Amino acid sequence: METIFKHFLLIVSAFCFAGTVAGQNPTIDPVAVFTNSESEQTELRPGESYSGSAPLTVEFSANPQDADGWTATYEWRFYTEGNTQQPYLIRYEENTNFTFTSAGTHLVACYAVFKRGDERIEYTEEYWTTEAQPIQISISESNLEMPNAFAPNGDPRSSIYKAKKNYKSIVEFHAIIINRWGQKLYEWDDPAGGWDGTFHGNPVAEGTYFVIVNAKGADGKVFKIRKDVNLLRGYREPASTTNP
């Protein structure tokens, strides 16, 4: 029996191990694909890294090459940085996906074993640990702030009441707008969403309203926000200027 060992590492911080085998022996070229914070599709391969906000959904592919006629098995192992001996998740698929919701650096490893008759080719950790190039995905600590005023006048900069743009790694979110009598006017479950200053499609009067937010970050931090919201009609945010 011929056995050839290889090892592939990929990290988000996820591990999947990479290498090449001479000739037409099957290989894997692991890749992680996701949409970054700028809404751009991003690919990571061994030796590359990414830092961003949760929740982050990543598609993993073992991407086998020259594998026709071979029977393959795959194992994706997910670790946290500093704990590479004990994966917190194992997936037995050629392609898989995972949503990262915990702050910190995650490591993901992809193992593959190819069999054809008496031949066996393994891409495992044992023989290529020194050449493993982790793809690292680091999830930031959480942050969430809500503004105290907005002006629903059609100006896209201020017409929707929503979380400030600096929010990060919010994995649970629920917000409610109420009036001074405690009547619920609007609620939403995504920090990217918000209130347009209407109730049942009709604009509400200028004045003071209240927002109640319950949220949780990827780092376990709990946010309980209660504050006034000043709705200003007829106000337009001044255009930004650049000093000469």
Each predicted region: which residue ranges?
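Surface-exposed, flexible coil segments in extracellular/virion-facing regions
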Residues: 71-98
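Bacterial Sec-dependent N-terminal signal peptides
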Residues: 1-28
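Short glycine/proline-centered coil/turn motifs in the loop regions
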Residues: 65-70, 167-169
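Short beta-strand/loop motifs in extracellular/secreted proteins, especially
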Residues: 70-74, 171-174
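Sec-dependent signal peptide cleavage junction
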Residues: 20-55, 237-244
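Short, solvent-exposed loop/turn segments at the edges of extracellular beta-sandwich modules
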Residues: 113-125, 216-220
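Terminal edge beta-strands and adjacent linker/stalk segments
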Residues: 125-136
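Short loop/turn motifs at secondary-structure boundaries
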Residues: 49-50, 54-61, 103, 134-244
